[in-house]
Curated annotation (Swiss-Prot):
Species of provenance: Polistes major
Role summary: Induces relaxation of arterial smooth muscle, by targeting bradykinin receptors (BDKRB). May cause hypotension.
Record keywords: Bradykinin receptor impairing toxin, G-protein coupled receptor impairing toxin, Hypotensive agent, Secreted, Toxin, Vasoactive, Vasodilator
GO cellular component, one term: extracellular region
Family according to the record: Belongs to the bradykinin-related peptide family.
Biological process (GO), any one: defense response
Designated name of the protein: Wasp kinin PMM1
Chief localization: secreted
Known tissue expression: Expressed by the venom gland.
Location of this chain's protein in the cell: Secreted
Length: 11
């Protein structure tokens, strides 16, 4: 899977 730069599933 590819995630965009700065992808934050958790903060």
């Amino acid at each position: 899977k590819r995630r965009p730069p700065g992808f934050t599933p958790f903060r």
